[in-house]
Amino acid sequence: MKTILVTGGAGYIGSHTILELLKEGSEECEVLILDDFSNSNPLIINKLNKMVNNVKVYARDCRDTIDDILTNHKIDGVIHFAASKAVGESVNNPLEYYDNNINSLLNILDACKRFDIRSLVFSSSCSLYGDVDKLPVNEDTELSDPQSPYAYTKLVGERIISDFCNSNSNISVVSLRYFNPVGAHESGEIGEYPITKPNNILPVICNSADTGEEMVVFGDTYDTRDGSCIRDYVHVSDIARAHVDSLNYMSSNVGICDVINLGSGDGVSVLELIKTFEEVNGVNINYKISDAREGDIVQIYSDSSKAKKLLGWETKYDIKDMVSSAWKWHKNL
């Protein structure tokens, strides 16, 4: 039986990845969750335990020592999600973001080296690309000067990993640059569960559909087909599956250090997303147009051909699946 350590495993993408890890049967895999629940909801653990077996939880900050855990378990691979992730919050609390996101990664890399853990998947972000002139973006697209402390922690994290791999050739690392994960598990049992007021687009839309509260669309005069920002939305279950694919890829490719985009390859505007949500779910969204928000990227979408080539990964779910699953989850809350 393989044992996988998932840091931040109670979070949005982490919890869906755990379901993917245990999808083929819990007799083949044991999952250890390392999470301090600072930005995740403990209720997710209850839901996971109802859906799968072989999940153990350690309520621990990733910056603290985990030697006792690693001594008691032979870890075959690590998926490192644990990080602070709100762009706006990072601007207001930059030192907290640098401390948490960088030091937790350093601690995990040090543990991998000392305990001979040879596979690591790192949660990175498309925010590293910023505004680009040529679309779609691939892994060779020049990275921008990060627009937020959050994005900068991901850029520094990737550089730290590159240096680490250069000096530890027996350890493989794949950094996955997510585009815009949305949606929820098809069961409706888990999904995005913000512990404060939602900031991400689909939870905000769901909240508006549920309560009638007016949501804000920031800008409708951008140089796009309808004036609103365009993003590459990808179903969270597709994102989750890529982490399992990455572990499988590293099991037969020792000493690699790769960066891989995860996106659908299709750009969808904010207004198109709202319209699709309304049509698929039979609801009306109360929204208003506000001024454009400083720092927002106008449009971005991914070339994910490298993911298909190396991991055999491609998206299974479309935008209709994303909005329907998100609404199903929201109604179950």
Annotate the PLM regions.
Residues 90, 142-143, 180-234, 261:
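A conserved pocket-lining segment of Rossmann-fold NAD(P)-dependent short-chain dehydrogenase/reductase
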Residues 68, 130, 142-150, 194-198, ...:
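Alpha-helix initiation/capping motif
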Residues 107-110, 155, 159, 203, ...:
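Generic recognition of well-ordered alpha-helical segments
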Residues 1-184:
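N-terminal Rossmann-like NAD(P)+-binding domain of SDR-like oxidoreductases, especially those catalyzing
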